[in-house]
Amino acid sequence: MTTVVVPRSAWRSLIAGSGLAALLQIDGTLVTVALPDVGRSLTVGPQPLAWVITVYFLTYVVFLLPGGRLVDRLGSRRTALAGLAVFSAGALAGALASSFPLLIASRALQGIGAGLASPAALAGAVSGFPPERRGSALGIWGASSGAANIVGPLLGGLLTSAFGWRAAWWALLPLAAASAAAVIRLLPATERATAPGGAGTFLRRRNVVLAAAAAGLTFLVMIGSFFVIEQYLQRSAGYSPLLAATAPAVIAVFIGAAGPTAGRLIDARGERPVALMSFLIAGAGLALYGLTGAPLHGFGALPLAILLGLGLGPLFAGTSRAALNAVPQHAHGRVSSLLSASRLLGAALGAGLSGLALRGGADATHVRPALTFGAALCIVVGLPVAALLRPPPAAQEQI
C-alpha cells in the first residue's frame, strides 16, 4: 500500500479549523448549562428557555449557505475572521442583556457569526488533506468537538456557580480572540474562485444528501439529550450547575475518544459500517434508560453517557468525510455549509422538541419518553440512512 504524505501546512490548517469548530461547539454546551440560572434570574420557565438555544441555531443555519459561498470565493481565513467578529459582538451583547428578549436578540447575532465561521472551520480543516486521508483528519476534528463538549459544560457550570450566568457569555470573548489568533497564524490567506453551481447542485449527489441527514440526526439526538439531562439534573435531582455539567462532560469524553480511532477505521473500511454501528450503539443506550427504570443520575447513569458518546462520536468524522469526498475541493465551502446547516437544524429541533417534552416538568416521567423518542430516531431513521451510504466514484474524489 502506498503511503500518502500529508504536508505540514495541512496539519497547521487542521489545528486552526478544529479550534474554530471547538469554539462554536463550546458555545452551545456552555450556554446550555447556564440556562436554569438564566431562567431564575430573568423569570423564565423551561419551555421558553429553549429559545436561547433554538434562536441561535436557526440564525446559524440561515447564514451557513452565504458563509459557504464566501469560503469558496474568499477563502477560509477571511470568512472565519468575519464570522468571529460578529459572533464576539453577539457574545458581548448577551453578557450585557438586561431582559430575556435582549438575550434572545444577542443569540441571534451570535448565530449569524457562527453561520459565517462554521463552513470555514470544516473546509479549512481538511484543505490540505487528500481524500484517502480525510477520515483521519476529520477524526481529529471530531475529537476537538468532543473536547469542546467537555470544556463547555464544566466551564459553564464553574462560571455559573461562581459568578452567575452572565459569566458564561463573558468567557466567550477571550475564547473567540484566541481562535482568531490561530486562524491568522495558521490558515493560509488564499483566494478561491467559485466554480459553477450553487449548493443545490450538490444535493443531487446521494452521499451529500445522506450525510447531511445523518449529521442532522446526530445533533438532534446530542443537543436534545444534553438539554433534557441538564434540566432533569438541576430541576429534579437537585444538582448544582457545576455538578450537573459532569453528565454532558462524560458524554463528551467518549465522543472525543471515539473520534481519532473512528477516523482511521473510516479511511480503511468506509463510512457505512461505522455509521451503522454508531446509530445502533447510541440507540441502545437511549432505549435502555428510556424504557427501563435505570437511574438517570449518579453512577447508575454512567452507561448511558458511555454508550451515547461512543455512538455519536464516530458520526462527526463519518458524515463529513462522506459528503466532502463526494464533491471536488472547490465546492467544500458550500458542502460544509450544507453539513453544518443540517447539524444546526437538528440541534434546533432537538432543543425545541426537548422543551416540549418537558413542558409538564423535568422529572423522570417526562425525561424517559424523551430518551425513548431519541432511541427510536436512531434505529428507525439513522440505521436506514447509514445503510444507503456508498463509496464515492473516483472522479468525485478529485481535488
Model-inferred region functions:
Residues 108-145:
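Cytoplasmic helix-loop-helix junction between adjacent transmembrane helices
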Residues 134, 173-196, 381-389:
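C-terminal membrane-cytosol helix-exit motif in multi-pass small-molecule transporters
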